[in-house]
């Protein structure tokens, strides 16, 4: 019986090149752990999601009670639902940290990898939004109505597009069925795109905290970074299990424990916490189309990051002005997240508008200008 050789077997060769003998920069920090954590989160979400789909019924008359049935009657159904719902929150925390690290250390200059990453972000956001609709509680129904209705701001075709998505003249059974179908399908598309993301990353190799060429100082991925990633996975699982077992409903909206009722509108319609920053930007503009464009811009701004890079240095490690201006929009996003959860009244309206203007000004104007100033200082 022949032995399997890592470098000869066609399947093992791919694994060997991407997980075992992958040349990695020796100085990458814990900020580089979030990629593997996102992979773990995706596997967890797909696994728990498949088991939940076995018991869920995508019908407006039975969807809410089927979720109650999962949590009460199915063996460990409460755990599956808790892991899936809170796993989404952990997924987005890792995702935002991963993007933040990419911006701070200039990883966006690897354009192909960066653009596939943004596509992954959009797909993940769409998947999470559709998943929020499935329990068919009050916030699910009204969230679906309000967010899909934003497309009606598109000139000429907006209304027809909304009705086409709804499958009728309002959010109804057809909407729930198609959202369930797409929510089940998109994670597999995300998995495929993740593979492309990794292939494009390994084409040039990982960036590192200094932003310099790390070719003279590479070490194999295994055992150094494989064990480092395992530590990250363990810490993440401890956090997720603590949240799921002790505070399973901490991040869910109380309104969603009430079955969907088209005749009763909740006092304050809002999405899940990880979309609140974009929702706050949307609400801060009085015009509907303007709000939708600002909402889209808050995320699509990531596409022009390589264009906005005016510095001679790739990373922000040795750039003090850029560091201050990096943490300013980070704090600004926290403020926007808080504002998105507040009712539409003063002083929240004013704070939201100020924070929205500040967000775009920092990214589009102040950070590129600071980089130009730092370039000038390097000449002295």
Swiss-Prot record:
InterPro entries: Cyt_b/b6_C (IPR005798), Cyt_b/b6_C_sf (IPR036150), Cyt_b/b6_N (IPR005797), Cytb/b6-like_sf (IPR027387), Cytochrome_b (IPR030689), Cytochrome_b_C_euk/bac (IPR048260), Cytochrome_b_N_euk/bac (IPR048259), Di-haem_cyt_TM (IPR016174). GO terms for molecular function: metal ion binding; ubiquinol-cytochrome-c reductase activity. Gene3D superfamilies: Cytochrome Bc1 Complex, Chain C. Its main location: mitochondrion. The keyword Cell membrane does not apply. Signal peptide: none annotated. PANTHER family: CYTOCHROME B. Belongs to the cytochrome b family. This is Cytochrome b. The gene is MT-CYB.
């Amino acid at each position: 019986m022949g032995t399997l050789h890592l470098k000869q077997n066609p399947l093992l060769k791919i694994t060997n090149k991407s997980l075992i003998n992958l040349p990695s920069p020796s100085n990458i920090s814990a900020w580089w752990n979030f990629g593997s954590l996102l992979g773990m989160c995706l596997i967890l979400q797909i696994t728990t999601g498949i088991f939940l789909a076995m018991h869920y019924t995508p019908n407006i008359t039975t969807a809410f009670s089927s979720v109650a049935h999962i949590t009460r009657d199915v063996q460990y159904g409460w755990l599956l639902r808790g892991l899936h719902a809170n796993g989404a929150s952990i997924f987005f925390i890792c995702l935002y940290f991963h993007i933040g690290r990419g911006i701070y250390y200039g990883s966006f200059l690897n354009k192909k990898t960066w653009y596939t990453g943004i596509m992954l972000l959009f797909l993940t956001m769409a998947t999470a939004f559709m998943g929020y609709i499935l329990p068919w509680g009050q916030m699910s129904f009204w969230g679906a109505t309000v967010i899909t209705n934003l497309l009606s701001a598109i000139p000429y075709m907006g209304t027809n597009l909304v009705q086409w998505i709804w499958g009728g003249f309002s959010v109804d059974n057809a909407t729930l069925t198609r959202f369930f179908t797409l929510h089940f399908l998109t994670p597999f598309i995300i998995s495929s795109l993740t593979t492309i993301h990794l292939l494009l990353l390994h084409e040039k190799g990982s960036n590192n905290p200094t932003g310099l060429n790390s070719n003279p100082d590479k070490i194999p991925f295994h055992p150094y970074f494989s064990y480092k990633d395992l530590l990250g996975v363990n810490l993440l699982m401890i956090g997720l299990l603590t949240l799921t077992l002790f505070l399973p409903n901490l991040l869910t909206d109380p309104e969603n424990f009430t079955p969907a009722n088209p005749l009763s509108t909740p006092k304050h319609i809002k999405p899940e916490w990880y979309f609140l920053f974009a929702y706050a930007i949307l609400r801060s503009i009085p015009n509907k189309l303007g709000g939708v464009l600002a909402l889209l811009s808050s995320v699509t701004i990531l596409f022009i990051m390589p264009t906005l890079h005016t510095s001679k240095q790739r990373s922000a490690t040795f750039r003090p002005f850029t560091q201050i201006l990096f943490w300013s929009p980070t704090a600004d996003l926290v403020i926007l997240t808080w504002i998105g959860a507040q009712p539409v009244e003063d002083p929240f309206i004013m704070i939201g508008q100020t924070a929205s203007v500040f967000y775009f000004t920092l990214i589009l104007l102040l950070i590129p200008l600071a980089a130009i100033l730092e370039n000038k200082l390097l000449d002295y």
